Amino acid sequence: MMKSRTRRALVLTGTAVAVSLALTGCSAINSILGGGRADADRDEETGQVTESANVDVFSVKLGDCMLETGSGMLTDANVVPCSEPHDEEVFYEIKMDDGEYSEDAISAASEGCIGDAYTSFVGVSYQESALDVTTLSPSKDSWEQANDRVIQCIIVDPAGQVEGSLKGAAR
């Protein structure tokens, strides 16, 4: 079953195992509502997180590893170096075309997280894998107010925290 979380509100959809976290608002709103800091400390060459930090949810980047984001209103995320125990890893991003906001279009595009991108990252198809997928997706507010068009595909091991990347895990 693919679930869908918004970055500020929980929304569930039905399909295999993906949770969509969608954005609502921009960094200024996050500051008002108590979101995390602007960004984590990162390696200048690789862009990888070098020190754990609670960051604004809009600062989450491809390759970031995070502690479980939970559900409900999400304004921030706890990013950690991938070498440390973590629950989630952003493994792919899907750029949506401009136009009117559509939950159906976002849900359909999110299916790309469990297709070829998943197989390329993990090494086996989603159907054969023991791993799950969540997505961080635009909400209506973030679409309209922050020009948010990116769906972030996030891989999760339902068995618990992992250390290191799940790239090539083949399970």
Label every PLM stretch briefly.
Residues 2-14:
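Bacterial N-terminal signal peptides that target proteins for export
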Residues 21-25:
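C-terminal motif of bacterial Sec signal peptides marking the signal peptidase cleavage site
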Residues 27-171:
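Primary mode marks residue(s) on the alpha4-beta5-alpha5 output face of response regulator receiver
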